[in-house]
């Protein structure tokens, strides 16, 4: 019995020495004037509760905004037209104007806003480019002669012809450049730059190197830029108005049709001429080509036009084509 007690005492003394050695090694790692023993922790610290976010309040605010918007949208339209010049647009359906009234309103806006009376009048058209069977109308460009021209500056026109007498006729009628294949390299090198390019039919096969360079300005029959009547073509392209579909928005066309100081009937006539030219680019039996039309000035908002009376009828176009022939 005494032997077992003696053995137990030795084990206890040895354990105390080992524990003292570990304590001294820990104190050497953290030198300080005051010794504070750090016990070994065998449990995880309790995590602090996360702060409550204001997600609920944000959702409530967004829901309230949605409710307000839905309430505004749910307001019924007022009957008739607004009696005053100042009114809430959401309470009335969008006004659709006849051309004459729209022009008069633009003139009235100019007086009230003290803007330039000679500012431009613009026509914005949204087009239906579908042809059926997954085909579309290609973006087009055209030049037309307006019934009441307003452009003061003449456009530069280059004439392609290999005939010396035709070159002389072109120069006498105001061509900026006239010549044959000798003009091709000069155009590729940007030595010659013109607003429009016209040609006689015989020289067309030799102009293929210019297709990529000129793009939509390359002479074509359907754009009236290829023909034999050089003086007539020069007159059209020097004084005519170019209209073309926007390159990015392929169903949108914007063009200047007049100045605001012109008489209302002249502005209306130019507008009708532009719409007739646009509608030539697509068969009428496929339905209306012009979907929406807005008339505006340089400083005013766009006024939605009543488009149905402006669209040409199929019988009218056939008669006009016969007269032209």
UniProtKB/Swiss-Prot annotation:
Entry keyword set: Mitochondrion, Ribonucleoprotein, Ribosomal protein, Transit peptide
UniProt-annotated location(s): Mitochondrion
GO molecular function, one term: RNA binding
Pfam families: Ribosomal_L1
InterPro entries in the record: Ribosomal_uL1-like, Ribosomal_uL1/biogenesis, Ribosomal_uL1_3-a/b-sand, Ribosomal_uL1_mit
Region annotated Disordered, chain positions: 47-66
Compositional bias segments (type: Basic and acidic residues): 56-66
Family annotation (SUPFAM superfamilies): Ribosomal protein L1
Transit peptide region: 1-50
GO terms, biological process: translation
Cellular component aspect of the GO annotation: large ribosomal subunit; mitochondrial inner membrane
Domain of life, per lineage: Eukaryota
Principal localisation: mitochondrion
Family: Belongs to the universal ribosomal protein uL1 family.
Name recorded for this polypeptide: Large ribosomal subunit protein uL1m
Organism: Bos taurus
């Amino acid at each position: 019995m005494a032997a077992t007690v003696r053995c137990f005492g030795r084990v206890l003394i040895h354990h105390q020495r080992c524990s003292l050695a570990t304590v001294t090694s820990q104190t050497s790692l953290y030198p300080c004037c005051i010794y504070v023993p750090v016990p070994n922790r065998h449990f995880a610290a309790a995590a602090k509760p996360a702060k409550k976010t204001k997600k609920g309040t944000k959702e409530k605010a967004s829901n309230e905004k949605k409710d307000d918007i839905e309430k505004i949208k749910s307001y019924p339209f007022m009957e008739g037209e607004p009696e005053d010049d100042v009114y809430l647009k959401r309470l009335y359906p969008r006004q659709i104007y006849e051309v004459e009234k729209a022009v008069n309103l633009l003139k009235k806006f100019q007086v009230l806003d003290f803007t330039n009376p000679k500012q431009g009048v613009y026509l914005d058209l949204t087009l239906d480019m579908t042809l059926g069977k997954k085909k579309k109308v290609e973006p087009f460009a055209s030049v037309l002669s307006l019934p009441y021209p307003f452009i003061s500056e003449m456009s530069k026109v280059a004439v392609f012809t290999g005939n010396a007498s035709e070159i002389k006729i072109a120069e006498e009628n105001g061509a900026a450049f006239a010549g044959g294949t000798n003009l091709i390299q000069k155009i590729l090198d940007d030595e010659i730059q013109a607003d429009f390019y016209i040609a006689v039919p015989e020289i067309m096969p030799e102009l293929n190197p210019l297709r990529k360079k000129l793009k939509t300005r390359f002479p074509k029959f359907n754009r009236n830029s290829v023909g034999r009547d050089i003086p007539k073509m020069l007159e059209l392209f020097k004084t005519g108005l170019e209209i073309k579909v926007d390159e990015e928005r392929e169903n949108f066309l914007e063009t200047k049709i007049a100045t605001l100081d012109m008489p209302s009937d002249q502005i209306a006539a130019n507008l009708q001429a532009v719409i007739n030219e646009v509608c030539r680019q697509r068969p009428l039996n496929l339905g209306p080509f012009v979907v929406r039309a807005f008339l505006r000035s340089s400083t005013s908002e766009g006024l939605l036009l009543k488009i149905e009376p402006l669209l040409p009828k199929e019988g009218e176009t056939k008669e006009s084509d016969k007269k032209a022939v």
